[in-house]
Curated annotation (Swiss-Prot):
Biological source species: Trichodesmium erythraeum (strain IMS101)
Protein's name according to its UniProt entry: Large ribosomal subunit protein bL17
SUPFAM superfamilies: Prokaryotic ribosomal protein L17 (SSF64263)
Coiled-coil zones: none
Subunit-structure text: Part of the 50S ribosomal subunit. Contacts protein L32.
S-adenosyl-L-methionine recorded as keyword: no
């Protein structure tokens, strides 16, 4: 039974899973949208929402937490500069997951996750 198992495992050890989510979050914020598998998209969605909420806060502590999570320092600065004007009136729901066709090789469910 999966009682209180809230973290999607994604078939990886903890360190690889964290690195994967950090990388996906960095790429999503950089490019605005990425195409990945549906479970990965759902997992990275909460991480990106957390980073945008930190950027809306705008404090020095929030900036340092984002710098510790995302891989690109310049990307953090641009996120903090534009987050307030882009997402100022929104209370969450900064990303959207759209289902797309299944992957040809292994028939995995694919999804496009994008920033709103």
């Amino acid at each position: 039974m999966r009682h209180s198992c809230r973290v999607p495992k994604l078939g990886k050890p903890t360190d690889q899973r964290r690195a994967l989510l950090r990388s996906l979050a960095t790429q999503l914020i950089r490019h605005g949208q990425i195409k990945t598998t549906k479970p990965r998209a759902k997992a990275v969605q909460s991480e990106v929402e957390r980073m945008i909420t930190l950027a809306k806060d705008g404090s020095l502590a929030a900036r340092r937490r984002a710098l510790g999570y995302l891989y690109d320092k310049k990307l953090v600065h641009s996120l903090f500069n534009e987050a307030q004007e882009r997402y100022g009136s929104r209370n969450g729901g900064y990303t959207r997951v759209l289902r797309t066709i299944r992957r040809r090789g292994d028939n995995a469910e694919m999804a496009i996750i994008e920033l709103i």
